[in-house]
Amino acid sequence: MAGELRIMENKSREDINLSPVSKIEIYSFFDPFSSDCFKLSAILSKLRIEYNQYIRIRHILNPSLKVLTKCQAQSTSNFDNIALAYKAAELQGRVRAERFIHLMQNEIIPKRDIITESMICDCIQNAGIDLEVFKDDLQKSKLTESLKIDLHIAREMEIEQAPSLVFFSEDVHEEGLKVEGLYPYHIYTYIINELMGKPIEKNLPPKLETYIQQQQLVTMEELLTIYEWPEKLLNKELKKLAIQQKIEKLKYPDGDFWKSKMPKIKSK
């Protein structure tokens, strides 16, 4: 489960000409086919909920040869190549692109890495992305150039595996901290608190019903991570929502999912 924590040289961010921000920047390098990356997405969702005013997360599909080769092998055209689809989604905003990849991971992991064009189209629309614009963007050669930029960033930060997170404080002259692999939630909160260097207040998560409506499709593991409730209590609350016809349970070989039956909340 655990990976490696190590300090990076401060040149990593400056060499790629990234402007400083007033928050902690977290670069998340992920593999859409990795179960550990799927688990980390729940942790990142919780971090964003609790520390939203202190952090900014940038998701980057790890452009390694292994990942890109698998993306190509799973596709029959640009329309079902998850790497190109993610870059095309980014052109309509990173928040929507992150929502898209979250929905795709919810589909990919339980279905044993199977990707179809219809699956991508459904996730694109559920993420609030204009489908026709997305299809046009998929035909543009600049997507490949964008992947090359991501590759440059990954090389500068010496990314060797996914998931990997790189934390930077607001001071561009400070060193970054790279966390390779998957760790318990408290490790990430400790890093954030240390980088802030002062007491910070956490936000509370939204109501369970609201969160599922926002995400549309969630796993038990994700909800247990977000809410930290006893599993028995969480199941009780989920059953209440199911009786109210607000959600439904979906069974997959790798676990149970809960799907919202409520109108989706549009991405901003």
Swiss-Prot record:
Q: How is its activity regulated?
A: In non-stressed conditions, mainly remains soluble. Forms aggregates in response to different environmental stresses such as heat shock, oxidative stress and antibiotic treatment, and cannot assist Spx degradation.
What this protein is called in its record is ClpXP adapter protein SpxH
The protein's superkingdom reads Bacteria
Protein function: Adapter protein required for efficient degradation of Spx by ClpXP under non-stress conditions. Interaction with Spx stabilizes Spx and exposes the C-terminus of Spx for recognition and proteolysis by ClpXP. Involved in disulfide stress regulation.
Result of altering residue 123 to G? Cannot restore wild-type level diamide susceptibility to the deletion mutant
| Effect of inactivating the gene | Inactivation of the gene increases the level of Spx protein and transcription of the Spx-regulated gene trxB. Disruption leads to an increase in hla (alpha-hemolysin) transcription and proteases production. It also leads to increased tolerance to the disulfide stress inducing compound diamide, increased peptidoglycan cross-linking, and moderate resistance to oxacillin and other beta-lactams antibiotics.
Matching HAMAP family, A to Z?
Adapter_SpxH
Key words, A-Z: Cytoplasm
An example of a Gene Ontology cellular component annotation for this protein is: cytoplasm
The UniProt record's further free-text remark is: Goehring et al. suggest that the cysteine residues are important for the role of YjbH/SpxH in disulfide stress management. However, mutation of all seven cysteine residues in B.subtilis ortholog by Engman et al. shows that these cysteines are dispensable for the function of the protein and that the activity of the adapter is not activated or deactivated via redox-active cysteines.
